[in-house]
Each structure stands twice: as C-alpha cells, then as structure tokens.
C-alpha cells in the first residue's frame, strides 16, 4: 500500500471533503480550504503551527513550499509508525480546516 492509498482510505471516513486530482497527485479540501495533499511518495499537511513545529522534529519531514503551516512527509518506509503519523496529521489538518 502506498502513502497516497493509506490517506485516500483514511479520508473516506471524513465528512465534507473534496478531492482535487492533479497530475502531481491529489489535494484534499474541506469546504474551500486545502488541508492535505499526496503524490510522488510524499504527503503534505496544513497543521496548527504548534503541531507543525512538533511534526518537523520527527523523521522524514520537512517544511513544505505550500506555506509555513504546511509539513511535507516523505517516509523512507511505510511502516506502522509512518501510517500512524500520516493518519493523525491528516485528521488534525482536517479538523483545522473547519475553523
């Protein structure tokens, strides 16, 4: 299973989400607000600044060029820990997009 597939499965359980397909992957929006994207073996999440700061201290993360509150996650291995982080950050980003 790929990171994109993991997130697509997780996002199916969330309400009020629109998937915008693009050549580089998919962007998920809640209402008009983008909150996550996936493609090319990586994902990006729009997180609360405090959550983003903590996320950037974990393996396989870096700042995203989408903005200061976005974190790029490109795990070397898609193990249980990577899946847990991706799903948690997806849910956090989705909740934040409602505000």
Region roles according to the model:
Residues 1-99:
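Charge-dense, helix-prone N-terminal extensions
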């Amino acid at each position: 299973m790929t990171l994109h597939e993991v997130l697509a499965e997780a996002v199916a359980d969330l309400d009020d989400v629109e998937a915008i397909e693009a050549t580089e992957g998919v962007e998920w929006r809640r209402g008009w607000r983008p909150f996550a994207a996936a493609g090319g073996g990586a994902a990006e999440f729009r997180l609360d600044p405090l959550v983003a700061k903590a996320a950037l201290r974990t393996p396989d993360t870096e700042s995203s060029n989408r903005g200061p509150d976005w974190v790029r996650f490109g795990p070397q291995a898609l193990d249980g820990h990577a899946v847990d982080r991706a799903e948690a950050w997806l849910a956090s980003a989705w909740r934040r997009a409602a505000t």
